[in-house]
């Protein structure tokens, strides 16, 4: 369009051309709609109101295609129908798949399944820290650990479907999702769960999926699973699946390093039962899978100590985090300090004492607890977690942690991460840097590293 405008502008012909030439007006209209489609997909605009973005994006696509159909000559319309056919085929296949998964007429009724035309009915339970547990018993399909579905609940969030990772295994015979409330649909789900009184009535839901694929982790010698907040819905099923395979004697993986970063101890309860079961299942195995699990609590006000004097401030963190004055903290009274893993230095070597490393760590400055060991013990007792699950304050030194596992691996290693954008970016950067240092791709003979990054959103 710029080429035409530049050519017409030399002769001041643009207004006259648009006035007398309907084809030019149609082309300009299509170009304007296409420009809006591109601009509206930019993250700052898209994230203002995602539900509105989806609706206007579909409407804009239909409008753009219609204008182009009118604009092009008759013998060129086939090139417009081609993408329309692809889009409609996708919609038809997805609709048929959705109907098959959710209509009970296509499936044999399982014992305990609710009667009705819709085969999937969900209960909603409020969890600590504004999270919602969505549970769907007796699903009609199978899935693999780490896969996700699009969940649609017309009675609570009409005309919307959102992607959520399945937090259970097929052997559990139920679908479960842990959904953190933000805004829009997730906030309405939490409000419904929080306001519901027992016994909780189930709601009809539609499930579209499962989707997602990754390399089987059981083919690696060492697996590092890193999650932030509800990212554990991705890593926990992977951990449980590896443990299950190990108990059945069908696993080549030697070690799993499980790291979960949360803001408060209330979030640990989301998967405390599953984590306890996985750790206890491998505890009795002879020469079986080794699971090393750590939970890092970054911003819980009950887990830090602060004295009146700035220089005398102390921390209960087992990883060497220090507490700053409240005046230096953010609005949520969350301070950033430096920390490393317990027993590890920056380079990844082990040491009986902790040594600070240049890694930003978030801890809090509101004093309640007075001794770290007492706090950790109380958390483990409260959540019935075994002592082998390390509870730490502050953020992990991911470079040292990952490097240690790669150095100790006896074969190829895999790193899988799911969480906020910041966590994913750090893991990407650290794994890439370590691979360069180890010269994995430069013919040194070092074993390869597989990295899988799973993110929130679309």
Regions found by a protein language model. Give the residues of each.
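Reductase modules of NAD(P)H-dependent flavoproteins
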Residues: 62, 177, 182-186, 191, ...
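FAD-binding FR-type
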Residues: 135-224, 240, 373-380, 434-458
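Cytosolic juxtamembrane regulatory segments of multi-pass membrane proteins
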Residues: 65-72, 112-139
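Structured alpha-helical bundle/scaffold domains in large eukaryotic membrane-trafficking regulators
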Residues: 47-51, 100-108, 247, 435, ...
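Membrane-embedded alpha-helical bundles of multi-pass integral membrane proteins
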Residues: 1-96, 100-101
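Hydrophobic, well-ordered secondary-structure elements that form the walls
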Residues: 166, 209, 235, 258, ...
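Classical protein tyrosine phosphatase
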Residues: 1, 86, 228-259
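Membrane-interfacial segments at transmembrane helix termini in multi-pass membrane proteins
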Residues: 85-124, 204
């Amino acid at each position: 369009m710029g080429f035409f405008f530049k050519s017409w502008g030399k002769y001041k012909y643009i207004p006259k051309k648009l006035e007398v030439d309907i084809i030019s007006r149609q082309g300009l209209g299509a170009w304007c709609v296409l420009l809006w489609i591109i601009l509206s997909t930019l993250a700052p605009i898209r994230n203002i109101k995602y539900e509105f973005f989806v609706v206007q994006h579909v409407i804009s696509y239909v409008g753009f295609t219609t204008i182009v159909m009118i604009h092009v000559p008759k013998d060129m319309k086939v090139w417009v129908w081609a993408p329309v056919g692809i889009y409609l085929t996708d919609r038809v296949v997805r609709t048929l798949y959705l109907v098959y998964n959710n209509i009970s007429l296509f499936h044999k009724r399982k014992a305990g399944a609710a009667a009705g035309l819709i085969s999937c009915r969900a209960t909603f339970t409020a969890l600590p820290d504004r999270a919602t547990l969505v549970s769907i018993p007796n699903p009609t399909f199978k899935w693999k650990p780490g896969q996700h579905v699009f969940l649609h609940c017309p009675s609570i969030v009409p005309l919307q479907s959102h992607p959520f990772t399945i937090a259970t295994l097929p052997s559990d015979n139920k679908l479960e999702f842990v959904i953190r409330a933000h805004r829009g649909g997730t906030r309405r789900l939490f409000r419904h769960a929080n306001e519901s009184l027992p016994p909780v009535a189930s709601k009809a839901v539609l499930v579209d999926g499962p989707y997602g694929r990754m390399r089987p982790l059981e083919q690696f010698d060492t697996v590092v699973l890193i999650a932030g907040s509800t990212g554990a819905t991705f890593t926990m099923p992977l951990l449980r699946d590896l443990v299950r395979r190990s108990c059945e004697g069908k696993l080549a993986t030697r070690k799993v390093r499980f790291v979960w970063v949360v803001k408060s101890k209330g979030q640990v309860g989301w998967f405390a039962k599953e984590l306890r079961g996985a750790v206890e299942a491998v505890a009795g195995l002879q020469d079986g899978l080794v699971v090393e699990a750590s939970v890092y609590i970054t911003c819980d006000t009950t887990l830090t100590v602060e004295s009146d004097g700035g220089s005398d401030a102390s921390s209960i963190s087992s990883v060497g985090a220090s507490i700053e004055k409240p005046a230096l903290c953010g609005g949520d009274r969350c301070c950033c300090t430096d920390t490393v893993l317990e027993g590890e230095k920056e380079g990844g070597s082990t040491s009986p004492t902790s040594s600070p490393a240049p890694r930003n760590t978030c801890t809090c400055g509101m004093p309640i607890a007075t001794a770290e060991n007492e706090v950790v013990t109380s958390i483990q007792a409260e959540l019935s977690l075994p002592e082998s699950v390390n509870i730490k304050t502050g953020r992990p030194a991911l470079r040292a942690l990952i490097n240690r596992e790669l150095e100790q691996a006896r074969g190829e290693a895999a790193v899988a991460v799911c969480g906020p954008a910041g966590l994913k970016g750090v893991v990407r950067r650290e794994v890439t840097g370590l691979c360069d240092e180890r010269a994995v791709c430069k013919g040194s003979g070092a074993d390869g590293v597989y990295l899988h990054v799973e993110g929130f959103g679309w």
